[in-house]
């Protein structure tokens, strides 16, 4: 635009040159404003983080300090309606609105000592929070960091457009003098007229709208995802999701709840007290489920003088009492009657996993159906046995499943599908899923999963809700449609304006108006993704 304005001044079209710069400057202001709308996700996210916290000192005095000065072990007072300043454990049952993290406005009940997260809102009465992470290590800080990184990683389409642009601009700079020469030497036009139309050509052939076709739209889609609890690690992941043809899914924490629940038991109260006392020394999920189920039992009468020992890989032992898997009883003379021993009140107690099958997410049923209706094959890969795999697959509507999968088996399934030229998605939440997530074309991690799984993935679903993945799939579809429409529109405008100029039907101000107008329209079209639902 600057070159065109200078050219207009050279041939004594000062007023048109000035008008060109005025229109260009006004358009730039509008473009910058529109583009900034798509990058506001970071500032909006940061607005959910309080800058100060009410720390309770050892003497009970409350001091307002910057959040970044909090350290692990500090006690913080969180009043009703306040945003929680940092990750920590609540001192009692609380109701928390986690919309800033998950996009879900329905309050979540957190039990005593359960972790609450920075940026969420205390919907109940005030409580005390024990700080478990520094301000740089909170879930919210990690989300902000991921969004920042995603916005700095261009999509494949953006990279392609940038590569084309550099070559295209060179061709325009070479082509304009050639165009002027043709008009002057072969069309019998005066130098002034030829040069003027050359400046118009320089203006209309500029690829500004084409360059803006992808980036603002991609940033808007990433921002939309962040506000809805979906984190994309760059534009490439955002674009690729819509091309997925097959989705391999882990079971626990993805289709089913990650926590075990006790559904049935056969033991008297004294036996249960012994079991709970022993399981309090274990961090195994089944042990935690048992302790949670019977947390109201009075354990004061239980003899805790004997040490509790771990039977590696099998269970726990306290004196003559064993709690564990069947192989924990391998030294018994009649191993085929484990359950009979329980019923008979034997002090050797069996706690089996068969009675603690996890429940499935209601959202998983709808998500699986939606993916299947979109012609995406959904396959369950689980390390559980055939019975559990068949049960869960049937409940959520999956017809193809494989049980007893090791991590290398999941990788093999992913690679085999890729050899058939399929675009493969893999969703999981555990360390055992990380290799498959890394090998898949699109790796999707559940936010409650391991950090290894999240590091290996391209997309992170903050809340364990498979419907969020389908939402992101539809968002990706819409992004690609908008980018395609932008590209077609911007190229069409360039072609039409170039043809009009060739036939002498275009002046410089009109050329600038249409050129800049097309760029603004392309950006605004991409910004629609900010409010997409």
Regions from the PLM with identified roles:
Residues 1-50, 104-193, 479:
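Actuator/coupling domain of P-type ATPases
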Residues 159-191, 197-207, 212-215, 484-516:
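Bilayer-spanning, highly hydrophobic alpha-helical transmembrane segments
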